[in-house]
Structures are given as C-alpha cells and as structure tokens.
Amino acid sequence: MFAREILRLLVALMFVSITMRSEAAADAAAPAMARELVFLNWSDYVDPELIHEFERRNGVRVRQVYYETDELLTDMLVEANGIGFDVVVASDTSLRALSRFGWIEPISEKAVPNLRHMDPRWLSSRVENTFGVPYLWGTVGIAYRADLLQRPITSWRQLYSPTADLHGRILMIQDSREVIGMALKALGRHADSNDPQDIADAAELVRAQAPHVGAWSYVSVNEDSALVTGEAWIAMIYNGDAVTLREYHPDIRYVVPEEGSYLWMDNLAILRATKNKALALRFIDFMSEPANAARNAAYLHFATPNRSAERLLPAEFLADPAIYPPKAVLEHSGFMPDRPPKVLRMINTVFSEVTQ
C-alpha cells in the first residue's frame, strides 16, 4: 500500500503547478453551470481526489451511479430510456451499442480541446471518430497466487481445464463475451470466431469448468479480496486490478497467457438526454487534461491513452509490463468484436446456465 501512496504523492507533486495554471485559466473562462453532474461509472474507477477537485473548481456536485457489468449498464439505460445521466464510462463494445441505440451524443474535437493530447492510435478507434473520448486501456489476463499455486501460469487452458487443487478456488469475470472469447483461445481457436461449432466447443469447455469456479464476479481490489486472503488462488481479471492487488500481497502475479487476450479501451461519453451538456463536456475535458489523466492512471494502475499524460508518469509505471503490455502480447491480442445476434444468444444462454 505504501508504494501506491508514494506513487500518488509523486505524481500529484509533479503536476501541482500544471494543475494550478489550468485551474486559473478555467476559472477565468467559466460559464454558468448546472449544480450536479450524474456520472455513470464502474465502482472505484476514478481517483476520488480528481472528482473533489472538479467539484471545487466548478462549484458543482458529481454524483456517481455505479454499474457492475456491461449488460447491467444497458439494462439501466433501457429502463431509464437514457434519461437521468450526464456522462458515462463505456467500453469500446458498449460504446458501439450505445451509439446504435442513439443514447450518446457526438463529441467534436473543438468541444474537448484536450483531445489533442491523445495518442492517434486510440483516436482512430473512436466509433466513427465521433463518439467517446478515450479514458483508459488495458488487457484481460490471469492473476494467481504464486506462493499457493507453486507453478507458473502460461496458458488459458490452465484456467479453463483446472487441476484438482484449484477446485473452488477460481474467480471468473462476470462477462459472457470475455469468458467465451478466452475459452476459444484456450481451445486454440480465434477469439473472434463466430463459427457455430467453435462457439459450441467453447461453451462446453465453460460448462466443464463451471463446477470448479468459486465465484462469477469481478475481483474486488482491497485487502479483503479473495486473492489476497487466499480463498481464491487464480482469477480472470483486468490488468490494473491485478496491479493494485499486488500491493496487498507480494505473491500475486499477473500474466497475459501465451495465446494472447482481449484488449479493451474505456471511453467517456455524453448521454444524448443530458440537460447538462456544457458541464458534461467540461468534465470530460478536465479528465483529459494531461496532469489529471496521469494522476488517474497512476491511481488506478491502468494505461492512459493520453500521450501527453504518459510523459508525466514515472518510468517504472511505464515499464511495468502488467500495465503497458509488451509488443509480443499486443501482437497476439485484439479488441473484442461485435458478434451476430444469433451468436450472442448462444453465448448468453450458456453463461446463464453456468452462473445461476
């Protein structure tokens, strides 16, 4: 834990003069704003000090509403008809769906000046270069307790076809598409395959694994996490969460298996039904300021798509392969595809079977 606090302190001190200059300029140009911004976000997925700073700088309150899966995000927006929220954190796959549903508002580069700091490779991933501002990116991999397992994890097969000592000690992400995609990798198939036989084989592998799984949920990132306490020995996990857990236990390891994995990028987007568009744009631009993007990345242990922010981060952070995967990992990995409705139904059916 001390390492995390020291890193946060160093990053904050490095950026304090930059932030003060940015704050003074913003205050001078500030128009009248709404009093509350509703931010639809994953839990524990933003540096709370940045939220407080935005509130103080703008004289507003940021109210976070949390969701725990992409499916729940969609359900929440369907139930509310997209009304009642201003800014949303959306994965690359969710962003495409939200744009098709007409729930999110196009964002121009003029409206978010700090887009100029983004690495062009991430801007090219924006849906039609119109929706969403890159927030954080990373990988899906495996975290495990090296002291308990006493053998290296190198393949997805070790997670999906577990040995007897892992019975009940496995945690799996609560995302049907990622679970099936990596099951395909474990079988030596392409993670993007929509071939019915490939999907059926992956589903059978997941069914066989299910009795050995202790829980289907996103891994908690605190001292009570099952990986920290030893209740779980191995978990499918997002890379930054594994890096955070390393600070609670030195024997937690993170690996992207040799078959490769999914890359992901989360984005900040504006709900079309917002009544606070000016404030929403200001919040997104604030989070995209290089100093703020760097602070957020350091706090959460995820890679930032903000090229100017990377220049402000410590060398040890940028050199950590769990945060910034090496070229060999990137070459065997890719973003999750959109799947045909028929395939999605197959995937969701098997996932419902094993998780209920």
Where are the language model's segments positioned?
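A ligand-binding cleft/hinge motif common to bilobed small-molecule-binding domains
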Residues: S94-A97, V228-T229, W233-D251
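Early extracytoplasmic/lumenal segment of secretory-pathway proteins
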Residues: A26-A97
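A bilobed periplasmic-binding-protein/Venus flytrap-type ligand-binding module shared by bacterial periplasmic
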Residues: G141-L148, K185-G188, M265-N276, R295
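Periplasmic-binding protein-like
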Residues: G138, I199-Q209, Y248-R272, L318
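Conserved C-terminal helix/tail region of periplasmic/extracytoplasmic solute-binding proteins
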Residues: A328-Q356
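Extracytoplasmic ligand-binding site segments that recognize negatively charged/polar headgroups
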Residues: G84, D92-G214, Y218-E231
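Mature extracytoplasmic/periplasmic domains
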Residues: L271-E331
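Paired acidic/hydrophobic, glycine-rich loop segments that form the ligand-binding mouth/hinge
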Residues: F85-V89, W216, W233-Y238, R253-Y254
